[in-house]
């Protein structure tokens, strides 16, 4: 009898704290991690490395199908490794991000990457970080969490991150951008950003990250009977 590895899906809007929560869960439980938001960016780098035409859906599909990528967490730091090389910084390049949005428009590439994401499911378990992990990618996951926070709080968090990196930022502009993205994500025709029907909805607006982690762990342990 084949035992299917459990999955904990963490969905939610940008700035809600998904990344921090997922890293903490992966380290605490010693499970695998999937950062779905990085997948398309990694594919762009792989295409550049292998001189595959970015505008060729036919050429990108086999590359997406066999994408050699893994996500490693150590002491709260996430490393994205492509073909043995740490590309954590390279995927944050603005050009890479813009190109990733372009290739995401290819239906067959999306389908290939959907299958590739599902292949991350392996023992002892998987923490899946994204926007449609519980609704589209792993609809059978036993533990689904939708992490949310007010748009004001998410804009404030983003502002602090940018300021810590030395950038001058305008809060109102950040807030406007976040609200616009929320509207797009929640009203798109394919895989809208909504909690799965059986997801635990956690509002992190007035919670510390330690409180969020504790609530998520307690929920997962109750469902999965983890020690």
Swiss-Prot record:
Q: Name one GO cellular component term.
A: cytosol
Keyword annotations of the record: ATP-binding, Cytoplasm, Kinase, Nucleotide-binding, Transferase
Q: Name one Pfam family in it.
A: Cytidylate_kin
One annotated GO molecular function is: dCMP kinase activity
Q: Just give the chief location class.
A: cytoplasm
| UniProt-annotated binding residues for ATP | 12-20
Which EC number(s) are documented for this chain?
Answer: 2.7.4.25
According to its UniProt entry, the protein's GO biological process terms are: nucleobase-containing small molecule interconversion; pyrimidine nucleotide metabolic process
Quote the subcellular location field of this record.
Cytoplasm
Q: Which family does it belong to?
A: Belongs to the cytidylate kinase family. Type 1 subfamily.
Which named protein is this?
Answer: Cytidylate kinase
Supply the gene name: cmk
């Amino acid at each position: 009898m084949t035992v299917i590895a459990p999955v904990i899906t963490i969905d939610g809007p940008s700035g809600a704290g998904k990344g921090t929560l997922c890293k903490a869960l992966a380290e605490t439980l010693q499970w695998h991690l999937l950062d779905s938001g990085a997948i398309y960016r990694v594919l762009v780098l792989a295409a550049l490395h292998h001189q595959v035409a970015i505008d060729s859906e036919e050429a990108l599909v086999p590359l997406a199908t066999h994408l050699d990528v893994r996500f490693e967490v150590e002491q709260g730091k996430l490393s994205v490794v492509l073909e043995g090389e740490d590309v954590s910084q390279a995927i944050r390049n603005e050009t890479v991000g813009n190109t990733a949005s372009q290739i995401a428009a290819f239906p067959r590439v999306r389908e290939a990457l959907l299958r590739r994401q599902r292949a991350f499911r392996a023992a002892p378990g998987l923490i899946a970080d994204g926007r449609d992990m519980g609704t589209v990618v792993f609809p059978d996951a036993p533990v689904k969490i939708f992490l949310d926070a007010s748009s004001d709080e998410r804009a404030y968090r983003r502002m602090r991150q940018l300021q810590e990196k030395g950038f001058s930022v305008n809060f109102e502009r950040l807030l406007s951008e976040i609200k616009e993205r929320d509207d797009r994500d929640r009203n798109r025709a394919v895989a809208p950003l909504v909690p799965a029907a059986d997801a635990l909805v956690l509002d992190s607006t007035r919670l510390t990250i330690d409180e969020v982690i504790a609530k998520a762990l307690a929920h997962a342990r109750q469902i999965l009977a983890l020690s």
